[in-house]
Amino acid sequence: MISMGEVRICIQYYDSPCGRLVLASFADRLCLCDWSDNPFAERNMLRLTRNMKTSFKTETTSVLEETKRQLDEYFAGKRKAFDIQLRLAGTDFQHEVWNALLDIPYGATKSYKDIAQCIGKPKAVRAVAGAIGANGISIMIPCHRVIGSDHSLTGYAGGLEAKRVLLGIETQI
């Protein structure tokens, strides 16, 4: 039961050129930027409520408004890096993988194998792929920059067309 004054996860939506994103913040940090039609969005939201021991409410916050502003700049080709405080909900291994994603430069790509090697676990390619798939902060933790070893576009929570658009923004194709 939620008590009066308990901090809850605030949620808003952002309509991007690639589809609708669900944004959430908790304690002045962004904790979710996920594609609303992602089949795993519900799982990511459940992970947040368990991790933070609270529930969602539809309300804006300064963090969510700033996130929307920075996303607008990104989609307009005016922003290459995000300056939003994040609150990640995941395992230590997932955090390690997500931090490796943050090191992929704007406009560059890496393979799942590259990420596995970056974190010192070269045989953990499938586990790395699973951690990338569990990323609940799309675009800002740039899982769209991960491609197949053969340079093919591979799965993405927002769909391959969204991945193509995001990479196109970053490479000015």
Question: PLM features: residue spans?
Answer:
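Short Lys/Arg-enriched helix C-cap and helix-to-coil transition segments
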Residues: I139-V146
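…primarily DNA-binding HTH/wHTH and HhH modules…
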Residues: S149-I173
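Basic nucleic-acid-binding alpha-helical/helix-turn surface characteristic of O6-alkylguanine DNA
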Residues: M1-P122, I169-I173
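Regulatory, non-catalytic segments
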Residues: R126-N135
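Short, hydrophobic-biased amphipathic alpha-helical segments
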Residues: N44, P142, A162-K163
